[in-house]
Amino acid sequence: MTHIKEIVVVSGKGGTGKTSLTGALSSLFRDKVIADCDVDAANLHMILQPEEVLQTKEFTGGKKARIDPDRCTKCGICREVCHYDAISEDFVVDTVSCEGCGACYFLCPAKAVNFSTRLAGYCYVCSTSGNGRFVFAELLPGEENSGKLVAMVRNETRTEAEKTGSNLILIDGPPGIGCPVISSITGTHLAVVVTEPTPTGIHDLKRIVELAHHFQIKAALVINKSDINPQYVQEMKQYCEEKGLIYLGEIPYETQITEAQKEAKAILDFAPECVASRAIREIYTKLQSILEEL
Amino acid sequence: MRDTNIAFASGKGGTGKTTVAVNLAYFLAYSQQQVQYLDCDVEEPNGHIFLKPEMDLKTPAKLMVPVIDQKKCTFCGECSAHCQFNALVTLPKNVLLFPELCHGCGLCVRICPENAITEGEREIGYIENGRAIHGIEFIHGVLNVGEPMAGPLIQEVKRQYKKQYVRIIDAPPGTSCPVVKTIADADAVVMVTEPTPFGLHDLKIAVSVAKNLGKPIGVAINRQNGEFPPLVTYLLKNNLPVIMVLPENREIARHYSMGNILLQTLPIYIDQFMELAVNIGRLLGKTKCRW
């Protein structure tokens, strides 16, 4: 079971084309399980259009404190011990500020604090037509612990891969470099970074590559919308060489991609012969040979 | 519009939050308003790329972390049993701390029966202050690479609020706790979206986050290229006002890719931002402030 390889698609900056690329690669790779780890704003299911939800699992998030006014003696200890200023002068807990540390709960002399978990999201294992198993999740709006839900998605995905005898897991990651991203990339074999040739693109690219290297994960680069600014493409290729990244290729700006998005279709199905689709097939071929060496 | 917090969120990444926020800040500052720009996307802060502030202060952001006196420790396990974040593990002759899991709540310090734990600090990133074009006060937080605790750094950025200013707050993408922390004290939230099924899907989640917090919401549509009927239907049904529309335009993309403030190099879009400012004023009228 250790022969399962995991590839994660990340970007640092949002909106560079992670999901479009993952969606396209999903229809090219055989024998794989696909995971959407962007649990805040999952989109891949809109392209893959799962046939059937095989399993729905509830995700319980962290605990939150609530003060029972009937038992509260207004002694003020909770306000004193709370590092997050989450308790008001009239002893009401602000659930936005509450981190769920339990300090007020454990230290309240009147035992007036309730401290319980609540439903924070769902994780779905699905079947798709032609794309194999697909796992994604929905964090309830505004909830915490997205990193933990990502871990749940990844566990379910591994279980599915073992069950179905798949040797590849393809993960669509969240934007950023924080908690859910760390949870998405740790233990993977390759991070495919999708960037765009803009100053924000290169700024965020450097931070996500640093993150991958911090966790000793090999990184590969795809430059999307590559013809917007050739100067940055050059700079990115140079950066790639300096940092020893694998250069997977570039996808030119293609209006068909926007059209495909509007219909929530993978670009390879929508316009199989457009320049972007051809570029993605080349990237896929390179990925295949890299996979053999991983 | 003084002393107001205007937050920019989106759900989906890359819809143009920073572009809209930066240009509104520019427009307001150009119109003689006192503007503070706070970049709360601490994982990937980008506002400085366009506003190019001259930074004059860099402060490390720290989070409390326990320091365990192994001599006093009896390895009773109380600290690790109480820690909600699994940041402490008690072994027979040692207590291990996983600093990146620690939320700095200080419960272990208070719960230890031997008083063997004291409060230390660790760096999670830094805050930079500077001044940008037309006197815009600029602040951003930059999270250390490998550090998962974005929340406390966002709080740190928000401690820098300047009174009497219009505060433009750029939120991170997504719909979970960092976004909630960022928009929690906003007087109005501008949702920047794009007219695609993905943009709309994520917009709906972001709107419900802001609605749960009771915020007035306006929607800015970026990269509009003909009407996207499902978006129009959703906005109408939920009574959400469209407060700005920017067209899909290669020139805008090109200027963005050069790191330009749009209004500086493509001033023809000034009408859109004037309209945005007026519409935000209307949104605020529903709460506490007026122009």
Per-range role (PLM):
Chain A
Residues 1, 211-294:
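C-terminal lobe/tail of nucleotide-utilizing enzymes
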Residues 32-45, 117-122:
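Short beta-strand-centered segment that lines the nucleotide-binding/catalytic pocket of NTP-utilizing
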